[in-house]
Amino acid sequence: MAALEAERERLVLRRFSYEDAWQLGILVRELAVERAAPVVIDVRHGARQVFRCALPGSSADNDAWIDRKRRVAERYAAPSFLVGARFRAKGTTFEDASRLDPNSYAAHGGSYPVSVEGVGIVGTVTVSGLPQAEDHALVVEALTRWVNPRAHQGG
């Protein structure tokens, strides 16, 4: 869990405009296409959906998962994967202990709050279609590249 907390601290953006949200969505899509990942991608600036894409092999169920995971990231101001891990670390589950409707909230990996330096959380990026750890990893890879693009140039 410490690694998830540290990851959260380093994935802070300098800014996040509507154009940034769109370009981040494109980056997530490019990474997903490279892997032939059957995912749905959702990027929000505040409450506004700026980017949404469904790739081959994904389903309408993934759309529902996007919404449920995003609600957790928004409510807890933390990645949905981390929220689930926090509950498990206490010896319980999100479903048993959160008192939130599991039809509306899911603490499964794949939704990440977008945080801006000196501002706080300004949006979310969410992926659904892979096992939860892989959904989370895809979002983290995209955010890592976004925060430090030079580290990923040239292979």
Predicted regions and their residues:
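Intrinsically disordered, low-complexity terminal regulatory regions
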Residues: 1-59
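Short, positively charged
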Residues: 18-22, 88-96, 148-154
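Secondary-structure boundary elements
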Residues: 34-35, 117-118, 145-150
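Structured interaction and signal-relay segments at domain junctions
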Residues: 36-100
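Short amphipathic alpha-helical leader/targeting segments
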Residues: 42, 61, 133-134, 153
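Short, solvent-exposed cationic patches
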Residues: 74-76, 136-155
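Extended hydrophobic
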Residues: 96-144
